[in-house]
Regions:
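Glycine-rich beta-alpha loop elements in corrinoid/cobalamin-binding modules
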Residues: 1-26, 228, 232, 236
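Short, hinge-like loop/turn segments at secondary-structure boundaries
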Residues: 4-7, 174-175, 213-215, 243-247
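Acidic/polar loop patches that form or flank catalytic/metal-binding clefts of enzymes
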Residues: 9-10, 99, 130, 195, ...
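Radical SAM enzyme core and accessory elements
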Residues: 19-20, 237-313
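Conserved ATP/PPi-binding loop(s) of AMP-dependent carboxylate-activating enzymes
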Residues: 26-38
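Short, electropositive alpha-helical surface patch
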Residues: 116-122, 206-223
Length: 313
């Protein structure tokens, strides 16, 4: 090995020493892997979950304070071959009769050139499948939305986190509430179902900011909001550093046991009452409406995300 050839551990790329020094050299990544569904699992998941999942890209260049993706997948974005993705979809349709696919990229609309090429490939190969993905409210225009819709896009799950600009800045987001409104309108105009996933009471999300988020939700049309309280603290994130400074966690805490950051003035019941008073579709994790999805999935054989049935004008 490297040591037998006289190389020290500090000379080996991506190797860490006990004192925290990392190996030198250029970081390397695995080449694009073969995209293929596992035959023994495909039928089970299609029946039970109503969709299959596939990844089109790995890596995330964003700076969200709570997110572990950059440290797990790297910050360099690597994409899969669109032809291989299309071929795999066609094979799954033929062998299992699937009609819905969810692209599990951390953020789908990173790299517009690649996404356009992927959508054009899906159209050219006539995959004729409905699909959804996680989107950022920033980085999509009307032309792209129309193309994605033509390629089968039916559901967008926006990682919005807040409808308050001050909180978005504190969370390390690269978009504003204005971007959220524009992206929502683009989806609505093209007939694409969309939902907003929110983190309330996270780092920097004050009581006043939460109230602004709830009030701004009145401006969202034909959608559903899924709010979550606080942030899970993961190692190697900015949130972990901030939480340690505030004494919320120890500096040597390995965070193997789940730890969460929740603003001191966050009141879940107050938030719940204010959200429901808007008349909009706010679905909290313990909401009885969540059981509707199980009923539709198992008893009526509905496919794809089922939150579209929870939307309100």
């Amino acid at each position: 090995g490297a040591l037998e050839r006289g190389r020290t551990e500090i000379d080996i790329p991506s190797v860490y020493t006990r004192d925290g020094r990392r190996g030198s050299g250029r970081r390397s990544y695995l080449p694009s892997i073969e995209v293929q569904f596992e035959p023994e699992l495909t039928g089970y998941y299609w029946k039970r979950s109503g969709m299959l999942n596939i990844q089109t890209k790995r890596g995330c260049p964003y700076d969200c304070i709570y997110c572990s993706y950059p440290s797990i997948d790297g910050r360099c974005v690597r994409t899969m071959d669109p032809e291989a993705i299309a071929e795999n979809i066609l094979r799954a349709k033929r062998d299992y009769g699937i009609s819905y696919l969810f692209f599990t990229d951390s953020v789908f609309n990173i790299g517009p050139e690649y996404n356009v090429r992927l959508a054009e490939t899906l159209i050219r190969r006539r995959t004729d499948i409905r699909w959804g993905a996680y989107f950022s409210p920033r980085g999509i225009d009307a032309e792209q939305m129309r193309l994605f819709r033509a390629s089968g896009l039916t559901h967008i799950e926006f990682g919005t986190e807040s409808f308050c600009d001050r909180t978005l800045e504190a969370y390390g987001k690269r978009f504003t509430f204005g971007d959220v409104e524009r992206a929502s309108r683009l989806a609505l105009d093209e007939g694409v179902y969309y939902a907003h996933f929110l983190i309330l009471g996270g780092y920097g999300d004050t009581r006043e900011n939460v109230r602004e988020t709830i009030e701004n939700s009145r401006r969202m049309e034909y959608t559903v909001m899924f709010p979550y309280a606080g942030m899970r603290i993961y190692p190697h994130t900015r949130l972990a550093e901030l939480a340690a400074k505030e004494g919320a966690i120890g500096r040597d805490d390995d965070l193997m046991a789940p730890s969460y950051y929740i603003s001191r003035d966050f009141d879940l019941e107050e938030v719940r009452r204010a959200a429901l008073a808007t008349g909009k579709a706010w679905v909290f994790p313990d909401d009885p409406q969540s059981a509707l999805a199980d009923t539709l999935r198992l008893k009526r054989n509905k496919k794809g995300p089922l939150w579209e049935y929870l939307r309100k004008p």
